[in-house]
Amino acid sequence: MSLKSERRGIHVDQSELLCKKGCGYYGNPAWQGFCSKCWREEYHKARQRQIQEDWELAERLQREEEEAFASSQSSQGAQSLTFSKFEEKKTNEKTRKVTTVKKFFSASSRAGSKKEIQEAKAPSPSINRQTSIETDRVTKEFIDFLKTFHKTGQEVYKQTKMFLEAMPYKRDLSIEEQSECTQDFYQNVAERMQTRGKVPPEKVEKIMDQIEKHIMTRLYKFVFCPETTDDEKKDLAIQKRIRALHWVTPQMLCVPVNEEIPEVSDMVVKAITDIIEMDSKRVPRDKLACITRCSKHIFNAIKITKNEPASADDFLPTLIYIVLKGNPPRLQSNIQYITRFCNPSRLMTGEDGYYFTNLCCAVAFIEKLDAQSLNLSQEDFDRYMSGQTSPRKQESESWPPEACLGVKQMYKNLDLLSQLNERQERIMNEAKKLEKDLIDWTDGIAKEVQDIVEKYPLEIKPPNQPLAAIDSENVENDKLPPPLQPQVYAG
């Protein structure tokens, strides 16, 4: 997969992300550019060719040995009887060895050896009882999920149980062969549900996700970064490579992200967190989910910076920058684990497959990164790699202090503190003003109440002259009109 470095940044033709056989699915560097389906076909063909070539070589060597032995027998007919008996004994031993090897590969021998392996490797009841809490939880969730599918769920559970019981006896196989067994299991279960169970595709996908979660939670510690592979060696190599490239700046990669914008800076931190969190997950689908979340944070950061949707040419350089800045633990082991044991349909299509393929491209670019990729001279690249100097140091010497990333962040924080101080002083002044207004308002209300009380007292004073009773003698009653004049009755 060719990676091009141009003035506007790193560019990868989107067609190069697809399977090189032209089937339309996403390819993978671990599969030599093929998709999962085409890679398995090519792998089987290559394996059959290798077996045929090995068989032909063995037959040719056997014929040459027999011819050489026959020739030596005819030329040494005059030798002593003792030597002839010695040769005869040697031939008998060789024949016996060949017979033993043939018996070993016979059906009865395979059955016997399998029985011995089962007796030797069958897990004891005590080991079965020592299951982790997470495994028990996942198993319970898996059973509860399958209950909703009735007969299909029972069949799926039966097949899954048989697969898990058979895997411990395959640990002597190479990790590629164990991966092939797992991929065959995925394919057989999915095909059986579609053909026999007539299960809709969307439900098949959900069931396959639960199957993957169930079996890989149980097999994780046996198949992730096994000792028989060089995964750990590759992890150390890529970590060392990333540490050596600590001097690479976003400008060299033409990363369209401005980390001075707070929202963008937050997105970058979240993207790094997600790519690092990938190592803590057990299920391939969960690891892919971390890659997908990381990629979406990258797209959001680019969108905020450019005020427009991000393109694929913007995404890949930024993903490379995130990987360099985060240096995720056991990166190669996680990529290999996903490649070997993830449901292949998830890697061949969809956003998960697209983002995973881009991550593989980013790692491949980092491994092959050179001076031309960064638009640098070979001399500068060598000096940066050797640690003699750093572009960040040169920038700090030639630029004003506020241009350095660390100093710039410090000034930014000081500016924020200054703004907070101004806001606090403004709030304090407003609070004091409010307090004074409340005091003035209280005094004003008290004065108004006092004035009203003085003007309209609450206590009613008795009148200076007594009030005239209606039946009392009043000289002024005569002045009233006749209807209103009081009448006096003698009691």
Curated annotation (Swiss-Prot):
Q: Which residues carry this modification: N6-acetyllysine?
A: 151, 170
Endpoints of the signal sequence: none
| Keywords tagged on the record | Acetylation, Coiled coil, Cytoplasm, Endocytosis, Endosome, Metal-binding, Phosphoprotein, Protein transport, Transport, Ubl conjugation, Ubl conjugation pathway, Zinc, Zinc-finger
The record's region (Disordered) falls at 66-85, 462-491
Question: Residue ranges of the VPS9 domain?
Answer: 232-375
One GO MF annotation is: guanyl-nucleotide exchange factor activity
Q: Name one Pfam family in it.
A: DUF5601
Name the InterPro entries on file: DUF5601, VPS9, Vps9-like, VPS9_dom_sf, Znf_A20
Where does the UniProt annotation locate this protein?
Answer: Cytoplasm; Early endosome; Recycling endosome
Coiled-coil region list = 407-448
The answer, when asked if Metal-binding is one of the entry's keywords, is yes
Main subcellular localisation:
cytoplasm
Where on the chain is Phosphoserine found, per UniProt? Answer: 124, 132, 373, 377, 390
Annotated positions binding Zn(2+): 19, 23, 35, 38
User: What does UniProt give as GO cellular component?
Assistant: cytosol; dendrite; early endosome; nucleolus; presynaptic endosome; recycling endosome; vesicle
Origin superkingdom: Eukaryota
User: Which cysteine pairs are joined by S-S bonds?
Assistant: none
Q: Where is this region: Interaction with ubiquitinated proteins?
A: 1-74
Share an example GO biological-process annotation for this protein: regulation of Fc receptor mediated stimulatory signaling pathway
PTM annotation, UniProt: Monoubiquitinated.
Briefly, what is this protein's role?
Rab effector protein acting as linker between gamma-adaptin, RAB4A or RAB5A. Involved in endocytic membrane fusion and membrane trafficking of recycling endosomes. Stimulates nucleotide exchange on RAB5A. Can act as a ubiquitin ligase.
Assembly state and interactors?
A: Heterodimer with RABEP1. The heterodimer binds RAB4A and RAB5A that have been activated by GTP-binding. Binds TSC2, GGA1, GGA2, GGA3, AP1G1 and AP1G2. Interacts with RAB21, and with 100-fold lower affinity also with RAB22. Interacts with ubiquitinated EGFR. Interacts with RGS14; the interaction is GTP-dependent.
Protein's name in the database = Rab5 GDP/GTP exchange factor
Q: What organism does this protein naturally occur in?
A: Mus musculus
Q: Which gene encodes it?
A: Rabgef1
